[in-house]
């Protein structure tokens, strides 16, 4: 009788996978570590006049507008689109805020009007993309160019300044020992997370980004979903515009939100979002915004000219896009398979 061989009971080795968000958190810690090496007192935080001050707090404060833009941009990119107009929408909202404040309107009317401009801008983009089927890049590029002109028309081509302590609180005040913009960004993140993860909206957005035709066949109103993402992106841009205008107590239509649309896109990409659409993570997009602001702060603290920011961001975008490319992924998979053999 031939001896029977015992069955192989060894379990296959599991491949190690980073926990969700770990690469982004490690990158953020590395950026902050480099900043601390450049500035010896980087981690020093003091409490003064009921508010925390220090470089880490300043990073949180300065990252708030980009984080707000990134929250809205995340939803748009998740549908496979892009919104290049968020910087211009910031300028429009800021110009509306300053002009109406100078005209003597009450604070609630000013805020509602500024938020309304963002919603209308997002609705305009949504109609062009979802209804008229214009490519998102081209559709939002129209408002990106025209929006600056609209903001200049609102301010009559002038830098409008105002003196309203109540409005200024939204840009330079404090709440719970933290700058007001940080609190606003956190509350917006929580609200959008609840909206997308505790309702079916998030699933619909991801379905549209993964396969819009399949989502439509499944009964999803893809036009409404796409339009809604652009409306929410415009709303986030308007909130950021109010914060910036309140911080400087004025509106500069030429420079408000200039090139911040690129920072918002970069924040989403750093957060793991794919420009092809699909799954998204709002929290990691905010972490991406913190990484960008951390790099900006490090460059300024190290004494390099501010123009270096754009070069560094371009290199980061290139590296992230290469890592996300199908060719690079296939190459890595091929190397792993050869190592196993």
UniProtKB/Swiss-Prot annotation:
Its main location: membrane. Residues 1-25, 130-136, 196-223, 277-281, 324-341 are cytoplasmic. The chain crosses the membrane at residues 26-46, 66-86, 87-107, 109-129, 137-157, 175-195, 224-244, 256-276, 282-302, 303-323. Keywords: Cell inner membrane, Cell membrane, Membrane, Sugar transport, Transmembrane, Transmembrane helix, Transport. GO terms for biological process: hexose import across plasma membrane. InterPro entries: ABC_transp_permease, YtfT. Residues 47-65, 108, 158-174, 245-255 are periplasmic. CDD domains: TM_PBP1_transp_AraH_like (cd06579). It is found in: Cell inner membrane. It holds the Pfam family BPD_transp_2. Part of the ABC transporter complex YtfQRT-YjfF involved in galactofuranose transport. Probably responsible for the translocation of the substrate across the membrane. NCBIfam families: YtfT_transport. This is Galactofuranose transporter permease protein YtfT.
